[in-house]
Amino acid sequence: KRALQSEKRRQHNASRRSMTRTYLKKVIAAIASGDKAAATAAFAVAQPIMDRMATKGLIHKNKAARHKSRLS
């Protein structure tokens, strides 16, 4: 039972981590394109997701803070 739970949790966490990285890539792509409005909008969407992942323990809170600081 524990092995099944662990595998299910691992897949769920991998999905969440991938989603987080995707949102970060969208922000970076918007910044690289030079579109300030799109970059601001993408950052506004990505910021609460980073906070949520840090709260749930998927990424360290300092890592979330570092990403937000570098992107803002």
Curated annotation (Swiss-Prot):
InterPro entries: Ribosomal_bS20 (IPR002583), Ribosomal_bS20_sf (IPR036510). PANTHER family: 30S RIBOSOMAL PROTEIN S20 (PTHR33398), SMALL RIBOSOMAL SUBUNIT PROTEIN BS20C (PTHR33398:SF1). This is Small ribosomal subunit protein bS20. GO terms for biological process: translation. GO terms for molecular function: small ribosomal subunit rRNA binding; structural constituent of ribosome. GO terms for cellular component: cytosol; small ribosomal subunit. Belongs to the bacterial ribosomal protein bS20 family. The gene is rpsT. Keywords: Ribonucleoprotein, Ribosomal protein, RNA-binding, rRNA-binding. Binds directly to 16S ribosomal RNA. Gene3D superfamilies: Ribosomal protein S20.
